[in-house]
């Protein structure tokens, strides 16, 4: 596997997410990290944990049992070369993006109904059904691949030499929206080492009381 500077295995220590910051809250992210500032649609948003120690997970993510299929438990390893990551890694990548690294994108693969319930600050919504080979509208899919992900089409072949590193997620371990997108990208040749999967998704993010936002009105 190629050595990718954005690989989660090379993620900086969490202390480096907020240089010089010392935890001053009662509910911190780690023992050495209170919060992380990221940019979301041009404004600074502070990601931290809910300080109400009686707070419970939102009802949208309290349900334990959903019909399977489609809501089936996802594997811990999605595909060879695709690294599974967790919350501290996601925060690391969101911070890098906010600091100006345009080679990374954290993608929320959920459809609008789910997105309306809440989003992770600093992420970009590209619904799974817009990147589903054979089902998505071809011109729209090509536009996403070229304009947002950095792929290029030449002589009826896709070229991925300068594509972005993608961190992808959806609702969590019981949701297949991000895994469907990842498998679709791999099928057309997107490099596996350029894809990271936040398997825990919104379920785990909400369970840890991390900051969410409501999406901007379109």
Per-region residue spans from a language model:
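Short, solvent-exposed loop/turn and secondary-structure capping segments
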Residues: 117-121, 138, 178-182, 208-209
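Sec-exported extracytoplasmic/periplasmic mature domains
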Residues: 95, 99, 186-190, 206-210
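Catalytic cysteine-centered active loop of the rhodanese-like fold, especially the PTP/DSP P-loop
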Residues: 142-202
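Flexible, polar/low-complexity N-terminal or interdomain linker segments that lie immediately upstream
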Residues: 1-105, 109-117
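Solvent-exposed loop/turn segments at secondary-structure junctions
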Residues: 111-114, 130-132, 172-176, 201-205
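Positively charged, proline/Ser/Thr-rich regional signature most characteristic
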Residues: 73-164, 215
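Active-site neighborhoods of enzymes that stabilize oxyanions during catalysis
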Residues: 208-218
């Amino acid at each position: 596997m190629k050595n990718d500077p954005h690989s989660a295995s090379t993620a900086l220590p969490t202390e480096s997410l907020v240089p010089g910051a010392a935890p001053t809250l009662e509910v911190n992210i780690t023992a050495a990290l209170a919060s992380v500032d990221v940019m979301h649609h041009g404004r600074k948003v502070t990601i931290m944990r809910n300080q109400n120690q009686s707070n419970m997970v939102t009802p949208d993510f309290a349900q334990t049992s959903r019909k399977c299929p489609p809501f089936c438990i996802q594997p811990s390893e999605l595909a060879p070369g695709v690294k599974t990551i967790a919350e501290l890694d996601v925060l690391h990548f969101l911070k890098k993006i906010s600091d100006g690294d345009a080679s990374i994108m954290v993608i929320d693969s959920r459809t609008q109904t789910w997105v309306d319930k809440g989003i992770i600050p600093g992420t970009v919504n590209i619904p799974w059904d817009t990147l589903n080979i054979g089902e998505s509208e071809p011109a729209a899919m090509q536009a996403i691949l070229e304009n947002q992900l950095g792929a290029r089409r030449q002589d009826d072949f896709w070229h991925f030499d300068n594509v972005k590193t993608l961190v992808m997620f959806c609702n969590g371990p019981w949701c297949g929206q991000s895994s469907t997108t990842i498998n679709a990208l791999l099928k057309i040749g997107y490099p596996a080492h350029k894809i990271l999967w936040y398997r825990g998704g919104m379920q785990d993010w909400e369970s840890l009381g991390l900051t969410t936002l409501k999406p901007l009105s379109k």
